[in-house]
Amino acid sequence: MDINEIREYLPHRYPFLLVDRVTELDVEAKRVRAYKNVTINEPFFNGHFPQHPIMPGVLIIEAMAQAAGLLGFKMMGVKPSDGTLYYFVGSDKLRFRQPVRPGDQLVLEADFLSNKRGIWKFDCRATVDGRPVCSAEIICAEQEI
């Protein structure tokens, strides 16, 4: 899935679209693998931190949630243009393991865990060069708009 198709399934736009490409999306296996190329040109590096730039943890979480959202949209067979959005509403078991720096490729993986009455749960991981960066269970709420 290239950036044009990603933009069909995610309502986010610059500077908040945090998925560059999907390399695997398997609806039957209920999993997605994607990545974000992190460059020094990201607007958040101006203030976080100019002399020692690292990607804010909340944006790593958001990137994982966006990957999970892509999986959710594909599993349901809908797009935001159909009148449905998935809102990030929480996380469980959140852990950060190492910082993400300019030049890193942030690999995002999400596996579907459950959907109960429109509350979706995904097991998400972010890695750089195969090393764990962040992991969490991401919780999203399905909402018609």
UniProtKB/Swiss-Prot annotation:
Gene Ontology process terms (BP): fatty acid biosynthetic process; lipid A biosynthetic process
UniProt subcellular location: Cytoplasm
Classification via InterPro entries: FabA_FabZ (IPR013114), FabZ (IPR010084), HotDog_dom_sf (IPR029069)
Keyword Amino-acid biosynthesis included in the entry's annotation: no
GO cellular component: cytoplasm; membrane
HAMAP family, per database record: FabZ
Name of the protein in question: 3-hydroxyacyl-[acyl-carrier-protein] dehydratase FabZ
Organism per entry: Stutzerimonas stutzeri (strain A1501)
